[in-house]
Every structure is written in structure tokens, then in C-alpha cells.
A protein has these predicted regions:
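Structural signature of extracellular appendage/secretion-system components
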Residues: 1-531
Length: 531
């Protein structure tokens, strides 16, 4: 037989369950603008009916419901959308870093403009043409020297500026690695707290949110994967457990966070600039590998992410040359190497022609440029030869004693269009240059077309980076909108829920009033006769 107070207990349970739902709704509304917050909902389930099956069960028709209970408060989140978002976030981080590095390089190269290298060299070639018309004119000779000095200074400016930006990118890499290690440690700490709470049968939803927010941030720097591991004990079935975060090194997983342990990311050949024992700064020779708490991973294992984009700008090693020196590739190392090749080739070929000509005083074998004994660093070391201090030594003539002969000035102006693939180049008045014997680093095209090709490729790379950045941003935004449609707080929806739960609460309270009136009639209104 049912208890007289059975209805009171069922109504009380209804009030408590609806109250929990109202409190959760209040929590959602309060955090509507909190970054990373996932809306929560109370899972309601009926309590076990009465009676339970057994030999001594009361003889009543069927089982009677006993009310409702809040089984859990859980997040409304779709894990698959998290995976999609983090993948797109990694791609966006990579293309943002690459686009930024190229944009800074384009600002330095400043093509086309009146102060860039191509324009400066055009003015130098034009000065040589003018000198060929007036080889005896001291003003024309002075202009040639000044234009040559402008070319040298432009090489220096470009080389120094690109080197400085590369250094700045290296500093940015160090800051990024420090931030990555900080995020890993914070995720580890959250894993610890979650592992202490879940076995007691609770869902630490706010800790889950904070952990997911940190992993979202981490995905901007590196392409990562996440594995879930149960914490055991009395954890609820929907408990998310601890997260293991990893990167792929080929087909092997390298764990950045594993339960309550966080790895440290560093550069084996790098330097520790803040004294914390972590080599967060990349080596000056370029990145070869990364160290993850003793596990070495290749730079190429970083498929996407801001860190890879920065390293590609800064420079990475691809092996060693015949002398055992590392071969460094990357946006800035490549452009610096190209400028060195250009400065060396330009200066060497120009000198080879100039030294065969004659000055006003009949002297010959005077170099015009100096400081180009090696290809490496030539853009920073090239300078005007001391012989050019005497303007009479500028070799505009192809014949000794013919001061009005400007044919060698024409030869010098034609250096801009010499095909570097030719073994030997013949010029006016029997002057020729054996290009094959000069061991030039550029062996195709011309001095001019090589530079134009590099600038053109820079423009193409910049356009591609900006296009991919825009595409990645659009895709990430699309996934984020889907994720927000599932997980974010809708104030309109919460207001409807509030009204729904309020009415249910009021109905349960009214039920108690009804039962109270029934009991009052039973207790106080029965068994009294004659009143």
C-alpha cells in the first residue's frame, strides 16, 4: 500500500529538480559573455518507481512513479566541432605568420618605388650611359661614383634590414615557445584538478571549459591531437576525464601533455635567454629539430600552426654542404642569400669589365667595387673600391690615351643585360669576359632578370599567403559559428527555459498545497460526528 505522504515526496522532488534547472539557467545567463563558456543543462530523470520487484511487494496495480531527480549537470558541446575548429585554427596560425613575414619583407624591398634596388641600379646604368657620351666630363664621372655608392648603400640597407627582421622573428619564436610551454603546464594543472573531482561523481564543467579554451589557444601555435582518458572511481559516464595532447612525428605520437605530466618544448641547439633552463630561442644557423622533454622531433613534423610559419620565415636547416656547414632555407635566409649572390655577381662581372678599360690618365686594372671576396655576406660587405676616390680612374675608355673614348662605359652599362649562362661574353673593342672562370653563384638569366624574378616570386608568395589566410579565417569562422550554435548561451532560449522551469516549480508547489488540503481533511475533518 502506498504511503499517505507519497505525493508530498514526489512533489518535493519535482520542486528540487526544477530549482536545480533554474539555478543552472541562472548560471548560463550570468556567463553569456564569458569567453570559452559552454552552456550547461540539467539532465532530469525519473526516480525509481514503487514498489521494487520482490516477493514481499505490496499488492497494488502496477508501479507508481516517485518523482524526478537531477542526475547531472553537463555541458552542451560537440567534440567533433572542436576537432574541426582546432584544425582550422592551426592552418590560420600558419598562414597569418607567413603572410606577416612576407608583408614585412615587401615593406623592406619596397618594390616598385624610387628608393628600391631596381630603381637605384637603373639610375646607375643610366649614369654609365651618360658617361659614355661625355667620358671626359668630371661631373658625369662624379655622378657615376655617386650612383654606384647609392647601389652599395641600398644593398647594405636591404641586407641589414632583412637581418634585423629575421632576428625579430627569432625573438618571436622564443616568445611563442614560452607561451606554448605555459599552456601545456596550465592544461596539466587542470587535468590534475579534474582527476581529483570526477571520481567523486561530479562534472567540473567550468574546468572543462577552461581546459578546452587553453587547447584552442595551443592549436593556434601547433597542429595537435587530443585523447581522452577516464579518471576512474565513481566518475559519471559522461565525465570527460583527463586529456592527453600530442603532435605527430611521422607516424608516432609525441605527447605534449599526458595526464598529470607536461612536456617542455625547446630547441636542442638554441639558447636560454631568460634563465629558466629552457632553450626557447632558436639557433642563429636556423632550426633543425625541436626537443619535447628529451624526444627529438623534426621541424617538418609541425604540419601547421604559427610556430611553423615563424620558423619558415626565420630559417630551417635542410642538411649540410660540402664543407659541413648547414644549408639554411626559409623566407629571410633565401632572400638574404639571393641578395648576396646578386651583389657578388654584379660586383664581380662589373669589375671584370672595368679592369679592362682605361681611365683619363691611361691607367687600367682598377676595380670599381671591393669587399666581394666571398658570396656569403656580399650584400653587406660590398663597397666602392678606394681607386674610385680618384674620378680619373673610372675606366670609360677601351683604349689607352683615348680620353674621348666612352666605349667601355657602354660595355659597363651593358653588364645589366649580360646572359650569365654564356661561358664567354664579347663586348665592344675586343673586351671580353670569361664568365665561366669567375665561378659566379648566378648562372642563368641576367643580373636584372634574376632580381626581377625574386621580387615577382615574393609578390606571388605574398598574394598566396593572404589568400590562404583569408580562406582559413573564413573556414574557422564557419566552424566557430556552428560550434557557437551548439554551445553558446542564447538569452532568448534561456528566458524560455526559465519560464518553463518556473511554471514546473510552481506546479510542484501547488501539488504540495493540494496534498496538504487532502491531509487536513483526512486528519482534522474525519472521525468527528455530530458537529
Amino acid at each position: 500500500m502506498l504511503s499517505t505522504f507519497h505525493g508530498l515526496e514526489a512533489a518535493r522532488r519535482g520542486m528540487m529538480a526544477q530549482q536545480a534547472a533554474l539555478y543552472t539557467t541562472s548560471h548560463n545567463i550570468a556567463n553569456a559573455n564569458t569567453e570559452g563558456y559552454t552552456r550547461q543543462r540539467v539532465q532530469l530523470q525519473p526516480t525509481p518507481p514503487f514498489p521494487t520487484p520482490g516477493l514481499n511487494r505490496p499488492n497494488i496495480p502496477g508501479q507508481m512513479g516517485t518523482g524526478v531527480e537531477a542526475s547531472s549537470v553537463e555541458r552542451v558541446r560537440e567534440y567533433f566541432l572542436d576537432i574541426q575548429y582546432r584544425g582550422e585554427n592551426s592552418k590560420l596560425g600558419y598562414w597569418e605568420a607567413r603572410a606577416d613575414a612576407i608583408a614585412k619583407m615587401e615593406d623592406i624591398m619596397n618594390e616598385p618605388s624610387d628608393s628600391e634596388l631596381a630603381k637605384t641600379m637603373d639610375q646607375f646604368w643610366q649614369a654609365m650611359q651618360d658617361l659614355s657620351v661625355n667620358p671626359e666630363n668630371e661631373g658625369a664621372r662624379s655622378v657615376v661614383r655617386q650612383r654606384g655608392l647609392a647601389v652599395v648603400e641600398t644593398f647594405h640597407y636591404l641586407s641589414n634590414s632583412l637581418t634585423q627582421i629575421r632576428t625579430d622573428i627569432g625573438t618571436q619564436i622564443g616568445t611563442t615557445v614560452t607561451e606554448i610551454n605555459s599552456l601545456l603546464n596550465q592544461i596539466r594543472a587542470l587535468n590534475e584538478r579534474i582527476a581529483e573531482i570526477e571520481p567523486n561523481g561530479y562534472l567540473p564543467n567550468d574546468l572543462y571549459d577552461e581546459r578546452d579554451r587553453l587547447i584552442d589557444q595551443l592549436s593556434q601555435y601547433m597542429e595537435i591531437g587530443v585523447e581522452k582518458h577516464p579518471t576512474g572511481g565513481n566518475a559519471l559516464p559522461m565525465a570527460e576525464g583527463t586529456y592527453d595532447v600530442y603532435v605527430m612525428n611521422g607516424s608516432a605520437k609525441v605527447y605534449l601533455v599526458q595526464g598529470r605530466t607536461a612536456s617542455v618544448v625547446s630547441f636542442p641547439d638554441g639558447s636560454d635567454v631568460d634563465g629558466d633552463g629552457v632553450k626557447e630561442m632558436p639557433p642563429a644557423s636556423g632550426v633543425n629539430t625541436l626537443d619535447v622533454s628529451g624526444t627529438t622531433i623534426s621541424f617538418t613534423a609541425l604540419a601547421n600552426g604559427k610556430l611553423r610559419g615563424l620558423i619558415e620565415g626565420y630559417g630551417y636547416q635542410t642538411g649540410t654542404d660540402a664543407s659541413g656547414q648547414p644549408i639554411v632555407k626559409g623566407l629571410y635566409p633565401d632572400m638574404l642569400a639571393n641578395l648576396d649572390k646578386l651583389a657578388y655577381t654584379f660586383g664581380t662581372v662589373f669589375n671584370a669589365v672595368h679592369q679592362q678599360g682605361y681611365g683619363l690618365n691611361g691607367s687600367t686594372n682598377h676595380p670599381f667595387f671591393d669587399g666581394i671576396s666571398a658570396v656569403s655576406g656580399a650584400a653587406n660587405t660590398i663597397k666602392l673600391a678606394a681607386d674610385t676616390d680618384d674620378l680619373a680612374n673610372i675606366a670609360a675608355s677601351t683604349k689607352s690615351g683615348e680620353t674621348g673614348n666612352g666605349n667601355n662605359a657602354i660595355n659597363l652599362a651593358n653588364v645589366r643585360s649580360l646572359l650569365l649562362s654564356n661561358a664567354t661574353v664579347s663586348l665592344q673593342d675586343g673586351i671580353s669576359v670569361n664568365l665561366a672562370s669567375l665561378n659566379l653563384p648566378l648562372s642563368s638569366g641576367t643580373v636584372e632578370t634574376n632580381y626581377q624574378g625574386w621580387i615577382g616570386q615574393l609578390g606571388v608568395d605574398g598574394e598566396q599567403a593572404n589568400r590562404m589566410k583569408t580562406n582559413s579565417e573564413t573556414l574557422r569562422q564557419s566552424v566557430e559559428e556552428k560550434r557557437q550554435s551548439v554551445s553558446s548561451v542564447s538569452l532568448d532560449e534561456e528566458m524560455m527555459n526559465m519560464i518553463k522551469f518556473q511554471h514546473a516549480y510552481n506546479a510542484a508547489a501547488r501539488q504540495i498545497t493540494v496534498i496538504d488540503e487532502m491531509l487536513d481533511k483526512l486528519i482534522n475533518g474525519m472521525g468527528v460526528v455530530g458537529r
